[in-house]
Amino acid sequence: MKISILSLFPELYETWINHSIISNAIKNNQVTIEIINFRLYTNDKHKKVDDYQYGGGAGMVLMIEPIVSAIRAIRTPNSYVILTTPKGQVFNQELANEFVSKYDHIIIIAGHYEGFDERINYYVDAQYSIGDFVLTGGELPSMVISDAVIRLLDGVISSSSLESESFNNYLLDYPVYTRPVVFEGHQVPDVLLSGHHKNIADFRKQQQEMITKKNRPDLYQKYLNSKK
């Protein structure tokens, strides 16, 4: 898979790309990541990428020309182009799985300032948000979306780890423990020390159901519906 991110601040991605699982995935040729500064695609001699909004209002708006030029320079017939914006559909694990199964090249546009000229929607395939809150720019959302997708690629993470993670089958992950057995009076549940695999599996499933029902009743209802 190839992921292209259009951003005004490419340097913000350096640590994310060069460490841990993402770095290993790049080294193992499981994913290619390119960060493109769309400021390079402006025809303005001052490299201007934003301007005042028509009708008045606070904040500067990203101009459409440099972004569209950047998209056209890298887009192929198989590319899926998405915009990060609080106005978009909320990105989730189901969409991450869908991206992996359907697309070989994802282009993510990370915005800044007051947002995009609305006409950008004629040149993208979808808009996505990572939650009901507003951030300074689209760099973090673009990393979040990319990270969620990359870790699902074959071989990036072991299949057993993926199977037990939160949101698999609409359930949040079960609690995990390590040494010491007792810390300041708080003890690891006895069942996890028993060595009885079925009892451990049952305990973990019960914990998943309980935690999901308490913290994410919306997901818990989906889980119940999936069992019908």
From Swiss-Prot:
Keywords for the protein's UniProt record, in alphabetical order: Cytoplasm, Methyltransferase, S-adenosyl-L-methionine, Transferase, tRNA processing
Compartments (UniProt record): Cytoplasm
Catalytic activity, as annotated: guanosine(37) in tRNA + S-adenosyl-L-methionine = N(1)-methylguanosine(37) in tRNA + S-adenosyl-L-homocysteine + H(+)
Disulfide bridge partners, by residue number: none
GO cellular component: cytosol
Binding site for S-adenosyl-L-methionine: G111, I130, G131, D132, F133, V134, L135
Matches recorded under InterPro entries: Alpha/beta_knot_MTases, tRNA_m1G_MeTrfase_C_sf, tRNA_m1G_MeTrfase_TrmD, tRNA_m1G_MTases_N, tRNA_MeTrfase_TRMD/TRM10
Record's subunit section: Homodimer.
Name used for this protein in its record: tRNA (guanine-N(1)-)-methyltransferase
Gene designation per UniProt: trmD
